[in-house]
């Protein structure tokens, strides 16, 4: 046998087929040692020829366990498990399919336990002169032989360039098909190359997983083994993101046009929109909370403000001149901020805007007026009243107002009203000493200055004489008559809850 051994692809195929499509590298070299010998140049050419033949029909892989090299027969030259070559040669010529489109190589690795030599077809010629550039699948698994009733498998033959864009595929019917005449289909049926390529792309791109329909995603999940949960979670998360993005509120075109026209203060466009939808007059800006009145006051356009109010009056629409924005500002606040005096006059004088409304920072419109504003404007807005309230007399440097000194439930004990500047002679009990005499001189001096305290007809200050009782002041021990003891007890009961407020109050020229 060794004498007739020749170095050819048929011999290598036969050797690998007899050993189940897999043999050790050293065993293969040892088998063809006789034809690889000779002179140096002859031996070199023989080795190169041997490498080309082996690469054409098989691949060399290294076992990661022990590092041993094995030669595996290529998938196109083997089927599931077959008897030796002589017993398995087909009696009938195989069917050949010629397709114009090149076939995508099958990406799923098929087990290769046996082999079947395809040299019976005279039309199929093996070109073994060049190297094979096809990428081979990973090493096949070693296992038991398959049964005779195994499903049909498609064997792909080597494609040669017999013509542009043409390829030849060799199909060999298995033994079960020849006997039964039918090809059963089962879960072990090889998958199409298109489906394998699709699964590979989907496995490497999670974005494509999300776009796959429910039916398509199941097939890909089965091939990956347990990837259905990951795909479902990715699909649910992407659905939540899309729903959150799509749930953003879209502004109505009419509201959008109204917001732009109101912010620009154009009456021509505002009139047309109001005619179409009168309810826009009280429409608030969803960002600042401004109405068209706020925008007109902010821009200082008193004519636009008057037109808007006249339109509301003409069409009997409710309009609130004191409406607040998101920051609590009224139209009067905005006009005072930007120093629009004419708008302030129109709002307060013509439309009776409330000057005592405070914004959310606690400030009135008069507190936004600049120092350069005329006195009559400040008086119109109420700034002079604020200055009078902040004067030293109001802060406690002068005479006190009764509303700030005494509770309201004891005002029935007040004496008759007197004019400002009148001197009151108070009866001070004998033996009474004030708590802070050092401040009396300063308080009296401030009260004696007539220039600082001017009488106002609309604000009359009430003066009275406070009766200092003995129990209210611990350090006061006056000698009282027996007839006044009952009155003192009544005063004590009425002022018992307020003794702490009177205990430390200093004497003044008003109360003694």
Curated annotation (Swiss-Prot):
Tree of life domain: Eukaryota
Amino acid composition bias (Acidic residues), ranges on this chain: 481-492
Biased composition (Basic residues): 453-462
Gene3D superfamilies referenced in this protein's UniProt entry, alphabetically: Ankyrin repeat-containing domain (1.25.40.20)
SUPFAM superfamilies found in the cross-reference section: Ankyrin repeat
Residues bearing PTM Omega-N-methylarginine: 395
Modified residues (Phosphoserine): 82, 125, 205
PROSITE patterns in UniProt: ANK_REP_REGION, ANK_REPEAT
Comp. bias regions, Low complexity: 173-186, 229-248
ANK repeats: 288-317, 327-357
Composition skew (Gly residues), residue ranges: 214-228
Keyword terms: ANK repeat, Methylation, Phosphoprotein, Repeat
Positions of the UniProt region annotated as Disordered: 126-248, 427-500
Pfam families: Ank_2 (PF12796)
UniProt similarity note: Belongs to the SOWAH family.
Protein name: Ankyrin repeat domain-containing protein SOWAHC
Species of provenance: Mus musculus (Mouse)
Record gene name: Sowahc
């Amino acid at each position: 046998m060794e004498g007739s051994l020749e170095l050819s692809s048929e011999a290598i195929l036969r050797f690998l087929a007899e050993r189940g499509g897999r043999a050790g590298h050293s065993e293969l070299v040892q088998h063809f040692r006789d034809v690889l010998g000779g002179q140096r140049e002859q031996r070199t050419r023989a080795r190169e020829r041997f490498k080309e033949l082996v690469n054409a029909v098989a691949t060399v892989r290294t076992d990661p366990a022990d590092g041993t090299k094995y030669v595996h027969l290529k998938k196109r030259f083997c089927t599931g498990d077959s008897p030796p070559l002589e017993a398995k040669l087909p009696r009938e010529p195989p069917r050949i399919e010629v397709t114009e489109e090149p076939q995508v190589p099958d990406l799923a690795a098929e087990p290769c336990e046996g082999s079947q030599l395809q040299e019976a077809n005279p039309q199929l010629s093996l070109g073994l002169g060049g190297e094979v550039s096809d990428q081979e699948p990973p090493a096949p698994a070693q296992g038991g032989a398959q049964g005779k009733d195994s499903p049909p498998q498609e064997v792909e033959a080597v494609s040669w360039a017999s013509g542009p864009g043409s390829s030849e595929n060799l199909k060999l019917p298995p033994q079960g098909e020849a006997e039964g005449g039918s090809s059963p289909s089962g879960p072990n049926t090889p998958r199409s190359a298109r489906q394998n390529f699709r699964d590979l792309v989907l496995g490497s791109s999670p974005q494509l997983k999300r776009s796959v329909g429910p039916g398509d995603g199941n097939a890909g999940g089965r091939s990956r083994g347990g990837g259905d949960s990951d795909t479902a979670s990715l699909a649910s998360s992407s659905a939540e993101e899309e729903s959150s993005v799509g749930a953003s509120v879209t502004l109505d075109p009419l509201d959008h046009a109204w917001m732009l026209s109101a912010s620009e203060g154009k009456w021509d466009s505002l009139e047309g929109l109001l005619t179409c939808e009168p309810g826009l007059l009280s429409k608030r800006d969803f960002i600042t909370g401004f109405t068209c009145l706020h925008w007109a006051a902010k821009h200082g356009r008193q004519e636009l403000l008057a037109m808007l109010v006249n339109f509301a009056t003409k069409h009997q629409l409710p309009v609130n001149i004191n409406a607040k924005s998101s920051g609590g500002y009224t139209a009067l606040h905005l006009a005072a901020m930007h120093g629009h005096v004419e708008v302030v006059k129109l709002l307060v004088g013509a439309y009776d805007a409330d000057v005592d409304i405070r914004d959310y920072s606690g400030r009135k419109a008069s507190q936004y007026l600049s120092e350069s504003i005329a006195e009559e404007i400040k008086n119109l807005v109420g700034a002079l009243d604020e200055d009078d309230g902040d004067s030293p007399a109001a802060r406690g440097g002068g005479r006190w107002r009764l509303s700030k000194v005494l509770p309201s439930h004891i005002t029935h004990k007040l004496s008759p009203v007197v004019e400002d500047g009148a001197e009151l002679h108070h009866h001070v009990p004998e033996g009474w000493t004030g708590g802070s005499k050092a401040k009396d001189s300063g308080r009296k001096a401030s009260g004696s200055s007539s220039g600082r305290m001017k009488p106002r007809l609309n604000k009359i200050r009430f003066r009275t004489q406070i009766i200092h009782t003995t129990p209210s002041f611990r350090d006061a021990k006056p000698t009282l008559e027996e007839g006044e003891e009952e009155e003192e007890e009544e005063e004590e009961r009425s002022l018992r809850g307020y003794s702490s407020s009177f205990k430390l109050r200093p004497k003044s020229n008003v109360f003694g």
